[in-house]
Amino acid sequence: MARKTPISLYRNIGISAHIDAGKTTTTERILFYTGLTHKLGEVHDGAATTDYMEQEQERGITITSAAVTSYWSGMAKQFPEHRFNIIDTPGHVDFTVEVERSMRVLDGAVMVYCAVGGVQPQSETVWRQANKYQVPRLAFVNKMDRQGANFFRVVEQMKTRLRANPVPIVIPVGAEDNFSGVVDLLKMKSIIWNEADKGTTFTYGDIPAELVETAEEWRQNMIEAAAEASEELMDKYLGGDELTEEEIVGALRQRTLAGEIQPMLCGSAFKNKGVQRMLDAVVELLPAPTDIPPVQGVNPNTEEADSRQASDEEKFSALAFKMLNDKYVGQLTFIRVYSGVVKSGDTVLNSVKGTRERIGRLVQMTAADRTEIEEVRAGDIAAAIGLKDVTTGETLCAESAPIILERMEFPEPVIHIAVEPKTKADQEKMGIALNRLAKEDPSFRVRTDEESGQTIISGMGELHLEIIVDRMKREFGVEANIGAPQVAYRETIRKAVKAEYKHAKQSGGKGQYGHVVIEMEPMEPGGEGYEFIDEIKGGVIPREFIPSVDKGIRDTLPNGIVAGYPVVDVRIRLVFGSYHDVDSSQLAFELAASQAFKEGMRQASPALLEPIMAVEVETPEEYMGDVMGDLNRRRGVVLGMDDDGIGGKKVRAEVPLAEMFGYSTDLRSATQGRATYSMEFKKYSEAPAHIAAAVTEARKG
């Protein structure tokens, strides 16, 4: 099968925003204008196409990023047909892992901001992630029809809060109830969309008299930004020559791809205005797969760096970036193909696990429908059915040319909840459900507590785990009771000590003998967490038993002596010991090492560590005192305060996770729902003595 759409006409884009900026409505309009959906789905009535999981519809927030394929030839059909793969990314802080994962497979992004609320704390998190993956982006200021809408204020906020370099290429005509369209600064004409056909057609008009001066000013700003792309253009501009529309677009594109500027547009998705011009900007200014650098990876056989060009001729390579369970076909694995071609029925290599996988069927998704396809080519995104053992973030590639694309790193979960099935019948189903969900979401973990036998689930926040429990119920029919959230404490040591243990048993026949002397010392926090150094001289412990000493200590790390939490940030030096020709064994040295470690830990002034969260609260000024007082009561340390640019304050603080449970409810009631907050894990630090005592008591109780 030949390629239908040239790779240069592909656009893999993410629509990214904080909650309530109107991202789902924006995505919905994109799908409408690109000819996919005929009835416009509104989030307000729970019918949006990309929010295809039931709970997303209930909560009105987008949780799983669906990859949707659609086509666009321009508002005035001025372009050849382009193929868009739109990846909808979640905007809630508990889902930042999902956002990171989407960023990894995007080529470009559209950041959606609310014309009233502007740049929110969550927007900053997403911006940082886009910087990390060097994603070129446009900004779309939505909700221009709302009371208090102000496009130019958002331009300023992008500069001050995101340290961005926004370059408006349109400006609004009117605002709030009078918002009627935009001025296109390239053509210097107004664009008014036809309300009768929901904005499918439009007319160019003259710029309203009161806007001519403002439009001139912003056009100059845009041309200056374009001229900086090259010396030639700068000379032409400074020489007083007009730059052509083509030159301006080409220069803006060049600088957008380099991450130097972020073109800005505006509109109201709800009122069907502005999204169409933004789609044209995606074609004009965001990258095709061939515009971004070749994807980097590592050859698993040689561990040497390797890369793949975005070309059908290259060997096949793809990244699995999302798992979904589908009622009808089972597991769907979304893959981004970076190079080569893969056909249904092909056998490929999972280079991370070193296993072979057969691609059963391939489907391309529109938000809730799917089309079977025979093959996927470089630069495209599709879902594979029938993969047996592939997890998010793993690479699929041709067996003849193995490569591991970037290993994605996921943060450690910070919150645990015990779950128990309501009935015996639910027990087995719950195990299957949790394992499937863990496969979809690497930031979610499942384990069994050895002492209590309870199933413990861990995740990135309360909402994250609430949604997991909710999905178990809906998708797998498992009813479960959940315990109170628990904090992922850790233990460590505060001083260096020397410890020794001799394990000697004689009980008729072969005895057991292992003797180790270790030195323990605290390590820099946040590093590897554990380091083992063999300093045995003169063979006092034979070589073959050294790994057993390491293993004995490693096996003891998960259960510390303060309150049974995992031990971190310790360095162990094995300095001396002895052995017995007959009675020494690997097991004897494991046991000796384990006991020596426990003994050493008791002497090394052990401490309990608790997770500290970076918390940002945006609040109207009149609630400032209450918010600060509440954070102090929660043992928070306020690091600073800024104006949020819209008459309120932004408070930055570090607060122990243990004190943050139920915070969203408390904050809502204290500020009549007007304050918002975001939090992410920052670091572990030592818990105060009274907290450590209470935690220890609770564990032993």
Curated annotation (Swiss-Prot):
Pfam families on file: EFG_C, EFG_III, EFG_IV, GTP_EFTU, GTP_EFTU_D2
Keyword Transcription: no
GO-annotated molecular function: GTP binding; GTPase activity; guanosine tetraphosphate binding; translation elongation factor activity
Gene3D superfamilies: 3.30.230.10, 3.30.70.240, Elongation Factor G (Translational Gtpase), domain 3 (3.30.70.870), P-loop containing nucleotide triphosphate hydrolases (3.40.50.300), Translation factors (2.40.30.10)
Residues binding GTP, per UniProt: 17-24, 88-92, 142-145
The keyword Lipid biosynthesis appears for this protein: no
Alphabetical UniProt keywords: Cytoplasm, Elongation factor, GTP-binding, Nucleotide-binding, Protein biosynthesis
UniProt cross-references to PROSITE patterns, sorted A to Z: G_TR_1, G_TR_2
GO biological process: ribosome disassembly
CDD domains per UniProt: EF-G, EFG_III, EFG_mtEFG1_IV, EFG_mtEFG_C, EFG_mtEFG_II
Residues annotated as signal peptide: none
Domain tr-type G: 8-290
GO cellular component: cytoplasm
InterPro entries from the UniProt entry: EFG_II, EFG_III, EFG_III/V, EFG_IV, EFG_V, EFG_V-like, EFTu-like_2, G_TR_CS
Domain of life (superkingdom): Bacteria
Record localization: Cytoplasm
NCBIfam families: EF-G (TIGR00484), PRK12740.1-5 (NF009381), small_GTP (TIGR00231)
Function: Catalyzes the GTP-dependent ribosomal translocation step during translation elongation. During this step, the ribosome changes from the pre-translocational (PRE) to the post-translocational (POST) state as the newly formed A-site-bound peptidyl-tRNA and P-site-bound deacylated tRNA move to the P and E sites, respectively. Catalyzes the coordinated movement of the two tRNA molecules, the mRNA and conformational changes in the ribosome.
Family: Belongs to the TRAFAC class translation factor GTPase superfamily. Classic translation factor GTPase family. EF-G/EF-2 subfamily.
Protein name, entry field: Elongation factor G
Organism: Neisseria meningitidis serogroup C / serotype 2a (strain ATCC 700532 / DSM 15464 / FAM18)
Biological classification of the source: Bacteria, Pseudomonadati, Pseudomonadota, Betaproteobacteria, Neisseriales
